């Protein structure tokens, strides 16, 4: 399936038409994984014991950068995902784009397909267990590192930090993530 995916995308679809959509969970107990301390002393930081409910970020990404996003308390359900597609993603889709989703059950609703195809776009699903083919996963890794550094301890601060972290993912980053996942993009003028 993975080889078929690479053949399909490499041979038939312009990578600049791809729109990857996924979700990332986070909470208020994120802390840096590495720290500096004076020689001979242990680096320390405080982390709340009660993480509270997860905050889920639903977002899209193209080769040009991060697209529209939505944060919700709790996890992604079919209703939450349909709401994201209908109110946030679909209004900015352009005819001819190809929306790529992973195989989460919430992504497979008929309403999701109708909303995407109704905008003149195509819907594709990644092969199972293939986060390495999804460049938004690499963007989320960068976002999570920035969230750890931010150390937000309230839900409101976490959502604000998510917005700031998403703004840091530049076009150059997105293009690099696409290329690292094997998608060929035309060279950009310097």
Q: How should these model regions be labeled?
A:
Residues 1-190:
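Short functional hotspots at interaction and active-site rims
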């Amino acid at each position: 399936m993975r080889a078929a995916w690479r053949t399909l995308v490499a041979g038939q679809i312009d990578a600049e038409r791809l729109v990857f959509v996924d979700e990332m969970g986070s909470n208020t107990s994120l802390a840096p994984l590495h720290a500096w301390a004076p020689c001979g002393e242990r680096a320390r930081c405080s982390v709340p014991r009660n993480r509270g409910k997860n905050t889920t970020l639903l977002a899209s990404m193209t080769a040009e950068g991060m697209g529209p996003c939505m944060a919700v308390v709790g996890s992604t359900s079919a209703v939450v995902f349909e709401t994201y597609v209908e109110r946030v993603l679909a209004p900015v889709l352009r005819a001819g784009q190809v929306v790529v989703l992973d195989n989460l059950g919430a992504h497979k609703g008929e309403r999701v397909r109708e909303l995407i195809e109704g905008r003149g776009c195509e819907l594709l699903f990644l092969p199972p267990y293939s986060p390495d083919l999804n460049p938004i996963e690499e963007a989320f890794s960068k976002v999570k590192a920035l969230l750890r550094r931010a150390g937000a301890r309230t839900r409101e601060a976490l959502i604000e930090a998510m917005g700031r972290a998403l703004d840091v993912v530049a076009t150059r980053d997105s293009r690099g993530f696409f290329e690292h996942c094997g998608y060929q993009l035309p060279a950009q003028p310097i």
